[in-house]
């Protein structure tokens, strides 16, 4: 499950995890810039619409909690920014703060 693409398509990752427990063993974790117009194909997403975790539209915390409950076994931090390293560092700090 790619929570960015799910949210971009007007769906809620938590709802899908709850509805299909065990169906998603892998999760790509990525956030969407606030103000991004949602809908359409995830293939149309621009690189600048991906932001560090916890700063965008996706309820990352809720998705991660649901992932633990409903059978996600592996998480992958996905970052598509041209200068991805600073955003990855910020996302890792966010994840570390969720403990």
Predicted segment positions?
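Histidine-acidic metal/acid-base catalytic patches
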Residues: 1, 7-99
């Amino acid at each position: 499950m790619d929570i960015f693409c799910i949210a971009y398509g007007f769906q809620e990752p938590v709802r899908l995890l709850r509805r299909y427990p065990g169906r998603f063993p892998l999760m790509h974790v990525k956030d969407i810039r606030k103000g991004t117009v949602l809908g359409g194909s995830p293939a149309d997403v621009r690189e600048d619409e991906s932001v560090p975790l916890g700063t965008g539209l996706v309820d990352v915390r809720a998705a991660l909690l649901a992932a633990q409950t409903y059978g996600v076994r592996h998480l992958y931090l996905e970052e598509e920014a041209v200068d991805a390293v600073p955003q990855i560092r910020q996302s890792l700090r966010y994840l570390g703060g969720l403990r």
